[in-house]
Design a protein with these regions (language model features):
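Glycine/small-residue-rich loop that forms an oxyanion/phosphate-binding "nest" at active or ligand-binding sites
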Residues: 83-102
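Conserved beta-strand segments of alpha/beta enzyme cores
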Residues: 9, 68, 98-100, 113
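Beta-strand-turn-beta hairpins that frame and shape the catalytic cleft
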Residues: 3-11, 106-116
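Short acidic low-complexity segments
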Residues: 31-35, 100-108
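Structural motif
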Residues: 10, 37-38, 112-113, 175-177
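N-terminal active-site segment of His-dependent metallophosphoesterases
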Residues: 1-71, 78-86, 143-147
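Active-site-proximal loop/helix segment associated with metal-binding centers of metalloenzymes
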Residues: 115-177, 182
Length: 183
């Protein structure tokens, strides 16, 4: 006896940087080959502060070609003086009815829990000086109205990691997919 079980196909992408005109033009001329039911973007798709981001034709195309489009914010979503805390610790933002950004949220599709979080990296104390000087994040991103610091980065890492661990422990889904931007 064979069971007729439908398997959800997940298509994954990251760092497409639609805020860059070359990338945006490329996506228009060479759309993704649709190979999944759900499209997951694990960060760095565009600047959240950019008012044109929700109006890109790409989202209409993605909405029409995928059952759901799940986006996790990466660090670049907050470039241009975006504030990491502007939306709170856990939030979602709709672009279209089936296209959403999620930060520290669980989305259940069928019997699969998608655990979605930026999961900022942990910066070791001995690396703080060089990371702070070398990464644009600390010049481009705000944190509660002031410049983002390595201590803020680590605080966000802990919040995200705690959220992921708790969500995995509490899930009752048959399957779990954890989506993060950082490791």
């Amino acid at each position: 006896m064979r069971l007729n079980v439908e398997i959800m196909k997940i298509q994954y992408a990251s760092d497409i940087h639609l805020e860059l005109s070359d990338n945006s033009r490329f996506i228009k001329s060479e759309p993704f080959e649709v190979t999944g039911d759900v499209l997951v973007f694990a960060g760095d798709t565009g600047y959240l502060r950019d008012r044109t981001l929700p109006n890109l034709r790409f989202w209409k195309w993605a909405s029409a070609n995928y059952r759901e489009v799940l986006l996790v914010p990466g660090n670049h979503e907050f470039y241009g003086n975006g504030d990491v805390l502007a939306y709170g610790d856990s939030w979602s933002r709709e672009i279209l009815p089936n296209v959403h950004y999620y930060q520290n949220k669980v989305v259940r599709i069928d019997n699969v829990d998608f655990i979605l979080s930026t999961l900022w990296s942990h910066i070791r104390p001995e690396d703080e000086y060089f990371v702070h000087r070398g990464m644009n994040d600390f010049r481009q991103i705000l944190y509660n109205g002031r410049r983002f610091t390595p201590a803020d980065f680590n605080a966000e890492h802990e919040k995200c990691l705690d959220f992921i661990k708790q969500s995995v422990a509490e899930s009752t889904a048959e399957r779990i997919v954890v989506v993060t931007h950082h490791l």
